[in-house]
């Protein structure tokens, strides 16, 4: 997946429901949003009915970009925090966690 495809999926997630507070990208789950305190699956094109570990990792690495410091922190600590922007649409606070 390329950044352009990630941005397209994030846009679909944002447009899927009203009052979205969180976007969730979790192994073994579909893409989900939190709306009014409820987790709701998001139908996207292409569909992601159940994210694989590989798909989730690719998604996270695209959000991290080429930031070596964040990548090293993720590897050494199992998590990293960053911000990500969809120009003209939204800015996100991102928390990436890895399972060992």
Task: Enumerate the language-model features and the residues they cover.
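N-terminal "pre-motor" subdomain/linker immediately upstream of P-loop NTPase catalytic cores
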Residues: 1-100
């Amino acid at each position: 997946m390329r950044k352009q495809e990630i941005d397209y999926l994030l846009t679909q997630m944002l447009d899927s429901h009203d009052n979205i507070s969180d976007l969730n990208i979790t192994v073994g789950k579909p893409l989900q949003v939190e709306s009014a305190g409820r987790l709701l699956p998001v139908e996207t094109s292409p569909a992601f009915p159940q994210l694989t570990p590989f798909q989730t990792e690719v998604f996270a690495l695209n959000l991290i970009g080429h930031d070596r410091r964040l990548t090293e922190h993720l590897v050494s600590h199992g998590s990293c925090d960053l911000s990500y922007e969809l120009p003209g649409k939204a800015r996100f606070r991102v928390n990436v966690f890895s399972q060992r």
